[in-house]
Swiss-Prot record:
Chloroplast among keywords: no
Family membership noted in the UniProt record: Belongs to the argininosuccinate synthase family. Type 1 subfamily.
NCBIfam families per the UniProt record, alphabetical: argG, PRK00509.1
Keywords for the protein's UniProt record, in alphabetical order: Amino-acid biosynthesis, Arginine biosynthesis, ATP-binding, Cytoplasm, Ligase, Nucleotide-binding
CDD domains per record: ASS
Binding site for L-citrulline: Y88, N124, R128, S176, S185, E261, Y273
Annotated residues for binding of ATP: A9, Y10, S11, G12, G13, V14, D15, T16, S17, A37, G118
Pfam families referenced in this protein's UniProt entry, alphabetically: Arginosuc_syn_C, Arginosuc_synth
Subunit note: Homotetramer.
Protein's gene: argG
Protein name: Argininosuccinate synthase
Organism: Prochlorococcus marinus (strain MIT 9211)
One MF term in the entry's GO annotations: argininosuccinate synthase activity
Length: 400
């Protein structure tokens, strides 16, 4: 099949920038349409059209996807308490299915022959893009130049320089960076020596402990149906809420992650993440669930949360299993209404209070050890006998 028109998922980084001349010169593509998703990157998006066009793209489309990114991806992750391997809140992984869906839509609208991405052959994003595209449009051809060209990062930078491509990395600062509203991910370069502390320069949206305020700050986050809706009594739209959560947590140095991560392709890698607001909201949400959900629901949901995070990390956002887990998780959130107080100080976010006027399962009359206690203590003996009966019978059988 001859490929004349391609829609490229474009970030403005060294790999996707180099993909444009590579697709034209090596694949024989006549027209490369660059598509960039606005996911709250801020200033990084300003020069992106010019970069794509100067690299050889026929046009560059920039779509504002911030609203669906928060409401359809970030908020479900908060409701799922999604932490891959117990640490990473999927800030980058959550963006990939949204980008893939819009990429497919644009390809169909423009009647393109194929889509393309600049993911390397050892990363996670190639899996996420390829599977999402195959699920949404199995008939669509996917070109993967960065998986085929066999160049090292230094060689890719040099290749881009030959075509006048201004890359956001250099040989002196060879980090690979992904940025969106939910956070930053940084890898490569000096970070590959896992015995060394990350240079402070890799952090941009969280303060070092030395530069955080000496005075702690207590904030209150209000949830409705499992979604955060207000901070300190002020109801906010989703974008403003995420921005404020990032500012508050980042100012106090909360939200840095330095982890050895198990990639989908089977290798371990060192990843640096800054996700101050998302981590803060997940922590507060977990606490509110502990107040409003029954114990058996919490235990079951905890197991499914791990699976949900794994599926999203592994590129299976559109899978039947992930959609089924959404159904369970969403049903549990009907009762997750209330507020959580969090103290931010020197890199920590400490829960200091929680309340739910509608759905609290903490009943003071039953929990108190004071005179208002309504718990019937004499019922405990019978309960313990029945509860421990299997153990008692097992012990008797051993003593025959």
């Amino acid at each position: 099949m001859e490929v004349k028109k391609v829609v490229l998922a474009y970030s403005g980084g060294v790999d996707t920038s180099s993909c444009i001349p590579y697709l034209i010169n090596e694949y024989g593509v006549e027209e490369v349409v660059a598509f960039a998703a606005d996911l709250g990157q801020g200033d990084e998006l300003e020069p992106i059209r010019e970069k794509a066009l100067s690299a050889g793209a026929s046009e560059c489309l920039v779509d504002d996807l911030v609203k669906p990114f928060i409401e359809d991806f970030a908020f479900p992750a908060i409701r799922a308490n999604a932490l891959y391997e117990g640490k990473y809140p999927l800030s980058t992984a959550l963006a990939r299915p949204l980008i893939s869906k819009r990429l497919v839509d644009i390809a169909k609208e423009l009647e393109a022959d194929a889509v393309a991405h600049g993911c390397t052959g050892k990363g996670n994003d190639q899996v996420r893009f390829d599977i999402a595209i195959a699920t949404l449009a199995p008939e669509l051809k996917v070109l993967t130049p960065a998986r085929q060209w066999g160049m090292s990062r230094e060689e890719v930078i040099a290749y881009g320089e030959r075509y006048g491509i201004p890359a956001p990395v250099s040989k002196k600062s060879p980090y690979s960076i992904d940025l969106n509203l939910l956070g930053r991910s940084v890898e490569a370069g000096p970070l590959e020596d896992i015995s060394l502390s990350p240079p402070e320069e890799v952090y941009q949206i969280t303060s070092s402990i030395e530069n955080t305020p000496d005075q702690s700050q207590e904030i209150e986050i209000i949830f409705e149906g499992g979604n955060p809706i207000a901070i300190d009594g002020v109801e906010l739209d989703p974008l403003s809420l995420i921005v404020l959560a990032n500012q508050l947590a980042g100012k106090h140095g909360f939200g840095r992650i330095d982890m050895i991560e198990n990639r989908v392709v089977g290798i371990k890698s060192r990843e640096i993440y800054e996700t101050p607001g998302l981590l803060l909201l997940i922590k507060a949400h977990q606490e509110l669930e502990s107040l409003t959900l029954p114990a058996d629901v919490l235990r079951t949901k905890s197991t499914l949360e791990t699976q949900w995070a794994d599926l999203v990390y592994q590129g299976l956002w559109f899978s039947p299993l992930k959609n089924a887990l959404d159904g369970f998780i969403d049903r549990t959130q009907d009762e997750v209404n209330g507020s959580v107080k969090v103290k931010l100080h020197k890199g920590n976010a400490t829960i200091t209070g929680r309340s739910s006027s509608q759905n609290s399962l903490y009943l003071p009359d039953f929990s108190t050890y004071g005179s208002q206690d309504k718990f019937k203590h004499d019922n405990a003996e019978g309960f313990i006998y029945i509860w421990g009966l299997p153990s008692r019978l097992w012990a008797q059988s051993k003593n025959k």
